[in-house]
């Protein structure tokens, strides 16, 4: 079966209030400080990440293919959207408690989703990860889930979900019964 075309590029979620967020650059002290902390924690990081701000608050982070392995500098941020795809990230405990709605972590080394438990994630992209379990996604409002090429076999964590799109090509999933009643 052919693999479907890649989904569209990361688009940060709409900000919760006011005007659209701006792209934080060197002129933003908060972004400059975060870039420096990311570089210190990840020596191979060259500062190519982009951050979206509104009213001085960082709301979204675009960090694909940035050689990040340590996400600790992001701990405590109230991010609504994040793309960490293509990074050698193994664990995501520092994302715990974030109000993430969109999270892209394709082609990472992440194997545990439990730190995401309770997050309001609507779109989650896990393509190409070594993930074997969806534990942690129970009861989440996920509508779009991309998990092509993962090692997940059991999708029971998605039972009762509001799932509208599920991409699971090249996975060993064989039982779709947990999705009965999904929209």
Regions found by a protein language model. Give the residues of each.
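Concave beta-strand-loop units of leucine-rich repeat
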Residues: 43-69, 76-111, 115-183
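The feature captures the LRR N-terminal capping module
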Residues: 4, 12-65, 164
